[in-house]
């Protein structure tokens, strides 16, 4: 009697699954375009990355349906219990993925009611979504701890060990969390510690115009050190001698007199050169007739008769 009831239940389940499988495949798979060449199909995104995500999900669902069909088609299988059903659903999950801690595990009992198929689909799809969120959360946590290393390497002596988590930067994907009430004091103490480790005021590269009030000897050292470091070494004796010569009036008057004498000499030299050039031009290009040897008496030119043969 028990075996006959099992056979009737299996037959009813098989008849229920037959119309559902073609309906899901018809909804998920796009219609075939027989007029096109096949290159512009809707199954591809156009960027060369492959099929669209919905096609991948539909194939995974179809593989799940095949597993369920093979499981229910075995004639000698015992009645499915809660453990068998849980094992069937957990085997569908990809390798290496586990549901998060604290999340309820959904166990769907195989039943002939109309809501059985909906429960199976929910169980096969929800764990995958939650595991994807867990993977991204782990990656962001790793990034946060990696960026946190340089901050915790130099903690302040007054900061408690448990408060270093408030200084960790948040990853781009995580929302910004407000630090606790003690976080502000920790940041201020670290800033004060960094301010005390800064270089002194007198060690700057440029000449400083302002001096800050500090205790006694430190102020004198800070005011004297920049002048000694920034200026190159100079011979004090040579500098004093050159400044003394320029300050004397006799030396200044001699320099001015020498300049004037040089200017006059240059003017005289230029005038002499111009005079020589003028005399040379007059001698070479003279238009006057040459003087005669008889005292300059005028003589008529002799006529030359021409005879024509």
From Swiss-Prot:
Q: How is it modified after translation?
A: Shedding is enhanced by a number of factors such as heparanase, thrombin or EGF. Also by stress and wound healing. PMA-mediated shedding is inhibited by TIMP3.
Q: Output the Gene Ontology cellular-component terms.
A: external side of plasma membrane; extracellular region
Q: Name one GO biological process term.
A: positive regulation of extracellular exosome assembly
Q: Which domain of life is it from?
A: Eukaryota
- Membrane-protein topology: Single-pass type I membrane protein
Q: Which residues carry this modification: Phosphoserine?
A: 284
What InterPro entries does the entry give? Answer: Neurexin-like, Syndecan, Syndecan/Neurexin_dom, Syndecan_CS
Q: Which residues constitute the signal peptide according to the record?
A: 1-22
Q: Which residues lie on this side of the membrane: Extracellular?
A: 24-253
Keywords in UniProt for this one?
Answer: Glycoprotein, Heparan sulfate, Membrane, Phosphoprotein, Proteoglycan, Secreted, Signal, Transmembrane, Transmembrane helix
SMART domains of this UniProt entry? 4.1m
* Transmembrane region(s): 254-274
Q: Which residues does the record list as glycosylated?
A: 37, 43, 45, 47, 205, 215
Main localization (coarse): membrane
Q: Where is the sequence biased in composition, kind Polar residues?
A: 142-151
List the molecular function annotations (GO) for this entry.
cargo receptor activity; identical protein binding
Instruction: List the PANTHER family hit by this protein, alphabetically.
Output: SYNDECAN, SYNDECAN-1
The similarity annotation says:
Belongs to the syndecan proteoglycan family.
**Assembly information from the UniProt record:** Interacts with CDCP1. Interacts (via C-terminus) with TIAM1 (via PDZ domain). Interacts with MDK.
The name under which this protein is listed is Syndecan-1
Q: Which gene encodes it?
A: SDC1
């Amino acid at each position: 009697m028990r075996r006959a009831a099992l056979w009737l239940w299996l037959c009813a389940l098989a008849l229920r699954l037959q119309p559902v499988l073609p309906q899901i495949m018809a909804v998920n798979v796009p219609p075939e375009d027989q007029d096109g060449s096949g290159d512009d199909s809707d199954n591809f995104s156009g960027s060369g990355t492959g099929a669209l995500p919905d096609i991948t999900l539909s194939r995974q669902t179809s593989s799940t349906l095949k597993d369920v069909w093979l499981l229910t088609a075995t004639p000698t299988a015992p009645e499915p219990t809660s453990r068998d059903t849980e094992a069937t659903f957990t085997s569908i999950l990809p390798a290496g993925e586990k549901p998060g801690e604290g999340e309820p595990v959904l166990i769907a009992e195989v039943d002939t009611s109309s809501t059985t198929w909906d429960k199976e689909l929910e169980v096969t799809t929800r764990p995958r979504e939650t595991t994807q969120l867990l993977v991204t959360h782990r990656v962001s946590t790793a990034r946060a701890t990696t960026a946190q290393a340089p901050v915790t390497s130099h903690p302040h002596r007054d900061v408690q060990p448990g408060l270093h988590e408030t200084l960790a930067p948040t990853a781009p994907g995580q929302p910004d969390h407000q630090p606790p009430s003690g976080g502000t004091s920790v940041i201020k103490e670290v800033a004060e510690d960094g301010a005390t480790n800064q270089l002194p005021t007198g060690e700057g590269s440029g000449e400083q115009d302002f001096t800050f009030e500090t205790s006694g000897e430190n102020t004198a050292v800070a005011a004297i050190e920049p002048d000694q470091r920034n200026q190159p070494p100079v011979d004090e004796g040579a500098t004093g001698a050159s400044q003394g010569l320029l300050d004397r009036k006799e030396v200044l008057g001699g320099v001015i007199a020498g300049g004037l004498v040089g200017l006059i000499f240059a003017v005289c030299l230029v005038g002499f050169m111009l005079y020589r050039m003028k005399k040379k031009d007059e001698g070479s290009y003279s238009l006057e007739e040459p003087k005669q040897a008889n005292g300059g008496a005028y003589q008529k030119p002799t006529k030359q008769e021409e005879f024509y043969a």
